[in-house]
Amino acid sequence: MSIKLIAVDIDGTLVNSKKEITPEVFAAIQDAKAAGVKVVIATGRPIAGVARLLDDLQLRDEGDYVVTFNGALVQETANGHEIISESLTYEDYLDMEFLSRKLGVHMHAITKDGIYTANRNIGKYTVHESTLVSMPIFYRTPEEMADKEIVKCMFIDEPEILDAAIEKIPADFYERYSINKSASFYLELLKKDVDKGSAITHLAEKLGLSKDETMAIGDEENDRAMLAVVGNPVVMENGNPELKKIAKYITKSNDESGVAHAIRTWVL
């Protein structure tokens, strides 16, 4: 059965180490689209952080979709219509804010419009995230966050500090929230059962596609959920070694246009 939907992660997958889309990847995506294959960007980034990529890849046509915030938001790219929109409650935010202070890690909350931190000394990885996704940073106290629609929170810090903090996260937190590590310095916390996998499953059902007709390409732990729900999971050569254990295929690295290799080898 032919593959009709490809979900593609961005960082470490779609773009190379210079955060660029290679000509080979661009051409392969255009050829897949011309063949009637849905190419869906699936990322932890907010929508503002993928707008330029959607334009560059010409994925703004009627019937094109994008998955952002690690699955909390699914939209039609032509008009912004929301298919899925999940958010955290204010109580969830307070829960996470309190835990971050207890663990001694920086935290920020992300809405559809900006990045909010209650840390007066804004962490460098919050600044990094702001630059990466083209969103402004706002300092707000926890009390000032009550009226914000928070899509996800992130614990962000030096890798060794974050890893030590992760070991101390209470078990019940994993029962109440969806928690994924998207980079060595990022831990993402979302509403329970929200991840790239749930988003891709919903989208495939909406499009009437079977599991065998779906493919996902990723490199990091926050891609695990979507790799687990598709019939054709592909992991990048530069991907997490643990993730490769669940892959059907291993493609070339992101610096070798691995997405293009996957599309041309197993789709077209």
Where are the language model's segments positioned?
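Mg2+-dependent phosphoryl-transfer enzymes with acidic/Ser/Thr/Gly-rich catalytic loops
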Residues: 1-5, 22, 188-268
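Asp-based phosphoryl-transfer active-site loop
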Residues: 4-18
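Active-site phosphate-binding/coordination module
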Residues: 23-123
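Hydrophobic packing residues within well-ordered alpha-helices of enzyme cores
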Residues: 25, 50-54, 165, 169, ...
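Short active-site oxyanion
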Residues: 36-40, 64, 152, 212-213, ...
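Short, structured coil segments at secondary-structure junctions
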Residues: 62, 70, 173-175, 229-230, ...
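Conserved acidic, metal-coordinating active-site core of Asp-based
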Residues: 99, 103-217, 224, 238
